[in-house]
UniProtKB/Swiss-Prot annotation:
The lineage of its organism: Bacteria, Pseudomonadati, Aquificota, Aquificia, Aquificales. This is Glutamyl-tRNA(Gln) amidotransferase subunit C. GO terms for molecular function: asparaginyl-tRNA synthase (glutamine-hydrolyzing) activity; ATP binding; glutaminyl-tRNA synthase (glutamine-hydrolyzing) activity. Heterotrimer of A, B and C subunits. The keyword Mitochondrion does not apply. GO terms for biological process: glutaminyl-tRNAGln biosynthesis via transamidation; regulation of translational fidelity; translation.
Length: 94
C-alpha cells in the first residue's frame, strides 16, 4: 500500500497541491497501479518475441519557411509580461 508521505512526496516533486481527500484517492490509485505492475511482472513472456517496428525512412514534411509571430501577437494573451517578455512563476529554487 502506498502511504500518505509517499503521495505527498510525489505531489511535491510534481509541484501539485493536493486537498486532503485527493491524497486518499491518489493513495488508492497509485497502489492499484503498482499492484497491476506486479501482476504484469508475473506473466510468462519467455516464448514471446519482442515487438520491434522499424521504418526504412522516417516520414518528414518539407521544410518550408513561414513568417513567425511578431512579438505583440505572441504576447497578446500572456497573463503577465514585462519589457516584451513573458513573466512566469519561478520553478527553480535558489
Amino acid at each position: 500500500m502506498v502511504d500518505r508521505e509517499w503521495v505527498l512526496k510525489i505531489a511535491k516533486l510534481a509541484r501539485l497541491e493536493l486537498k486532503e481527500e485527493e491524497i486518499e484517492v491518489f493513495q488508492k490509485q497509485l497502489s492499484d497501479i503498482l499492484d497491476f505492475i506486479d501482476q504484469l511482472k508475473e506473466l510468462d513472456t519467455e516464448n514471446v518475441e519482442p515487438y520491434i517496428q522499424e521504418f526504412e525512412e522516417t516520414p518528414m514534411r518539407e521544410d518550408e519557411p513561414h513568417p513567425s509571430l511578431d512579438r505583440e501577437k505572441a504576447l497578446m494573451n500572456a497573463p503577465e509580461r514585462k519589457d516584451g517578455f513573458f513573466v512566469v512563476p519561478r520553478v527553480v529554487e535558489v
